[in-house]
């Protein structure tokens, strides 16, 4: 058949598809990427967009590995660490579903739980630290020190290992994940913004003027991930809402995106409202309320006595089905500081841990915060997640797509 234009063949790239916490994403070793995608830039972004199947005007990511939600449109690049006393560098890319954008501005706390396991399985952690006990089956905990390259922070993952191999199966249950697995403890060290104040405005609570919405009380914090917290009742909600109530309401989504954009300007993350469209990953916007009974998305009944506070958070323009791991760090940190909206909704006072209700159930997370010379700081935040490999092999994409 003469006259046909020859098309570039597909290329094969080694990759691993992993769940971490309530998210899942495609993991790459930096050295396995095509050479032109081993450095930041358009080639890398275009490769990851094609892998995930974005931008997709249908919003389904049918022609890629993405799952058409913010929790499943994620990519991770791991490499031997460039930092002293760290095992790996971890770079996270949040891929937009309907726009040609990979957002590198923040971390994914859920996938962090999978980074430690991936680092061990990929040979980035010395074998001496993952001993094989031979015929004796012994599960040990291996500490993996991770440099989070997006936000320049240290994260410690404590990964269970049995006879030299990552232990993925177990009985740890995590609301938002159907099946139990092995527990991975994750510690976020000094999770507040290292380049500025934890509270960028200098206040625990601000008046945030949002055109078309009004003036809202807001706690704007940069810990784990920049987050704008507002009171649920200020925008007509009670904090027990599930996804359909928010995600099925275009007006509500537009309102929350407007709040997020004006919060981003107030926090100094962007200079103009227009920039928010290409910075979808950060900041997050969340609304809080005192505890109340509700039915989680699984049908499980959550009772007031089981939780300290209700939190609902939006990610990439949609209400999250559970809670982003980094937002959980922000929640724990804000809850530990008397006077923030999160702390007040949880009953006020000093606390080192908080159990919050989210659409899929509950989560407990701890934080150690203290005030030094009038500035609040947090030394670490701790949570438990789980992770496992879903698939490993090769990703195939057209060779001319990047």
Tell what function each PLM region has:
Residues 2-402:
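A glycine-rich beta-to-alpha transition motif near the start of alpha/beta enzyme domains, typified by
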């Amino acid at each position: 058949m003469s006259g046909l234009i020859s098309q570039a063949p597909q290329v094969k790239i080694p990759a691993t598809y992993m769940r971490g916490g309530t998210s899942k994403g495609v993991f790459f070793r930096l050295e396995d990427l095509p050479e032109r995608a081993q450095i930041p830039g358009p080639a890398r972004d275009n490769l990851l967009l094609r892998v995930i199947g974005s931008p997709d005007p249908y919003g389904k990511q049918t022609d890629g590995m993405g799952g058409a939600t913010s929790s499943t449109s994620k990519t991770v690049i791991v490499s031997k660490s460039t930092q002293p006393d760290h095992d790996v560098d971890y770079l996270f890319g949040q891929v937009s579903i309907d726009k040609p954008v990979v957002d590198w501005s923040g971390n994914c706390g859920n996938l962090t739980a999978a980074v430690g396991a991936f680092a061990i399985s990929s040979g980035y952690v010395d074998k001496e630290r993952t001993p094989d006990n031979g015929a004796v089956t012994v599960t040990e905990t291996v500490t993996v020190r991770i440099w989070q390259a997006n936000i320049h922070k240290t994260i410690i993952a404590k990964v269970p290992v049995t006879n030299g191999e990552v232990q993925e199966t177990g009985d740890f249950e995590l609301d938002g994940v159907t099946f139990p697995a092995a527990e991975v403890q994750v510690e976020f060290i000094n999770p507040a913004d290292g380049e500025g104040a934890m509270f960028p405005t200098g206040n625990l609570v601000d008046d945030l003027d949002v055109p078309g919405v009004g003036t809202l009380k807001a706690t704007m914090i940069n810990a784990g991930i920049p987050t704008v917290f507002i009171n649920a009742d200020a925008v007509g909600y009670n904090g027990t809402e599930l996804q359909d109530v928010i995600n099925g309401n275009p007006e509500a989504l537009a309102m929350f995106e407007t709040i997020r954009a004006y919060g981003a300007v107030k926090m100094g993350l962007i200079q103009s409202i227009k920039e928010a469209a290409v910075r979808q990953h950060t900041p997050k916007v969340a609304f809080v309320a005192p505890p109340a009974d509700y039915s989680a998305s699984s049908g499980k009944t959550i009772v007031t006595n089981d939780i300290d506070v209700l939190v609902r958070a939006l990610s990439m323009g949609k209400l999250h089905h559970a809670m982003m791991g980094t937002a959980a760090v922000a929640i724990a940190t804000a809850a530990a500081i008397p006077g923030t909206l999160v702390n007040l909704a949880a009953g006020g006072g000093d606390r080192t841990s908080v159990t919050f209700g989210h659409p899929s159930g509950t989560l407990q997370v701890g934080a150690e915060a203290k005030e030094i010379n009038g500035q609040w700081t947090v030394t670490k935040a701790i949570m438990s997640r789980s992770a496992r490999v879903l698939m490993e092999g090769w990703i195939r994409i057209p060779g001319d797509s990047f």
